[in-house]
């Protein structure tokens, strides 16, 4: 069974690094992927996209037994609009948005664990919850 569900941005600049990062942590072949512009941001505003994402998670939960959702956001994401170019500010804002998305997902899927990571242009992965800002 596949225990993990990855939500990541469709931005080509971060695809390879994200999959490599997952492989290095033993997730190779152990995750379903939803790659969508803005990653989990659509859970916060657009009803149609929110429904799409939640339906994908529900499908994976029912058919693949997922227990964990791993969210990746990245630096300089066009879906975030015009925000600060300062990496630390972006990390803080993205972690806030991912936490909001987590609350939406946990409301629908209370038994699913959620992990959140921000990826910098230097391909450094910053887990949410670490006091780095």
What spans do the regions from the language model cover?
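Divalent-metal-activated hydrolytic enzyme cores
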Residues: 1-4, 9-18, 37-51, 61-67, ...
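Short, contiguous, well-structured surface segments enriched in hydrophobic/aromatic residues
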Residues: 31-34
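Acidic beta-strand-to-loop metal/phosphate-binding motif
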Residues: 68-74
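Short glycine/proline-enriched loop/turn "hinge" motifs that connect secondary-structure elements
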Residues: 25-28, 63-64
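Short Gly/aromatic-enriched secondary-structure transition segments
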Residues: 19-25
């Amino acid at each position: 069974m596949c225990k993990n569900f990855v939500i990541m941005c469709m931005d080509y600049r971060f695809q390879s690094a994200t999959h490599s990062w997952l492989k290095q942590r033993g997730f190779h072949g152990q995750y379903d992927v939803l790659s969508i512009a803005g990653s989990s941001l659509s859970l916060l505003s657009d009803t149609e996209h929110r429904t799409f994402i939640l339906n994908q998670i529900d499908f994976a939960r029912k058919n693949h037994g997922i227990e964990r959702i791993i969210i990746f956001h990245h630096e300089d994401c066009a879906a975030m609009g015009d925000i600060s170019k300062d990496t630390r500010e972006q990390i803080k804002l993205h972690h806030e948005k991912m936490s909001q998305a987590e609350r939406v997902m946990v409301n629908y899927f209370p038994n699913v664990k959620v992990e959140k990571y921000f990826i910098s242009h230097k391909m450094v992965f910053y887990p949410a919850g670490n006091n780095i800002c």
